[in-house]
């Protein structure tokens, strides 16, 4: 009988935290995502995804088609849009087109994604549901690699094998890495 795999604790349910959780879950690796805010929080309107990023994500999620991503996350999807960015430069005052790539010879490589829609799409890209615990703001961490405990401001404590800090630039955990 094989040794049971320890749970990986992920701090932050933004795009990176959910993508990490989805990849781990799809590969049978137990994990829990902890998010300080509520499920209905906004994370900003949109993000631009470059081809090297979305193609890698689509491949990692099981060679999903690009059309699946675009249909789910393009900010203009509800009016038939595709989210593609034309990369044209316009005069801010007049709207006059200053420079634009020739789209008959230039491949479109940047797609705009609604952040909330992208988070939902990532969470739904698999057979198994992600385990996301909202209302869990990290307070402290005890232990070492292989045996860590995350302690949250709401009094909850969770043990795991390691912690992945995916809670952004104002990370609760990242400043503690050196200590």
From Swiss-Prot:
UniProt: FAD binding residues: 35, 46, 119
UniProt keyword Repeat present: no
Keywords: FAD, Flavoprotein, Glycoprotein, Monooxygenase, Oxidoreductase, Signal
Gene3D superfamilies membership: FAD/NAD(P)-binding domain
Molecular function per GO: FAD binding; monooxygenase activity
Signal peptide start and end residues: 1-21
InterPro entries from the UniProt entry: FAD-bd (IPR002938), FAD/NAD-bd_sf (IPR036188)
Glycan-modified residues: 92, 170
EC number(s) reported in the record: 1.-.-.-
Disulfide bonds: none
Pathway stated in the Swiss-Prot or TrEMBL entry: Secondary metabolite biosynthesis
Keyword Flavoprotein: yes
Cofactors named for this entry: FAD
Function (record text): FAD-dependent monooxygenase; part of the gene cluster that mediates the biosynthesis of neosartoricin B, a prenylated anthracenone that probably exhibits T-cell antiproliferative activity, suggestive of a physiological role as an immunosuppressive agent. The non-reducing polyketide synthase nscA probably synthesizes and cyclizes the decaketide backbone. The hydrolase nscB then mediates the product release through hydrolysis followed by spontaneous decarboxylation. The prenyltransferase nscD catalyzes the addition of the dimethylallyl group to the aromatic C5.
Family note: Belongs to the paxM FAD-dependent monooxygenase family.
Protein name: FAD-dependent monooxygenase nscC
Gene (name only): nscC
């Amino acid at each position: 009988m094989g040794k049971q795999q320890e749970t990986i604790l992920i701090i932050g349910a933004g795009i990176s935290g959910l993508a990490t959780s989805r990849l781990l879950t799809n590969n049978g690796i137990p994990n829990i995502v902890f998010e300080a805010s509520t499920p209905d929080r906004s994370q900003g309107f949109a993000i631009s995804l470059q081809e090297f990023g979305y193609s890698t994500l689509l491949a990692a999620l099981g060679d999903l088609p690009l059309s699946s991503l675009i249909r789910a996350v393009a900010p203009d999807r509800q009016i038939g849009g595709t989210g593609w960015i034309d990369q044209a430069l316009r005069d801010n005052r007049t709207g006059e087109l200053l420079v634009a790539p020739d789209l008959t010879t230039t491949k479109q490589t940047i797609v705009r994604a609604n952040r909330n829609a992208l988070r939902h799409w990532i969470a739904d890209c698999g057979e198994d549901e992600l385990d996301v615990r909202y209302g869990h703001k990290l307070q402290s961490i005890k232990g070492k690699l292989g045996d860590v405990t995350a302690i949250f401001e709401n009094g909850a404590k969770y043990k795991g094998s390691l912690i992945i800090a995916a809670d952004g630039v104002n990370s609760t955990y990242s400043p503690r890495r050196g200590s």
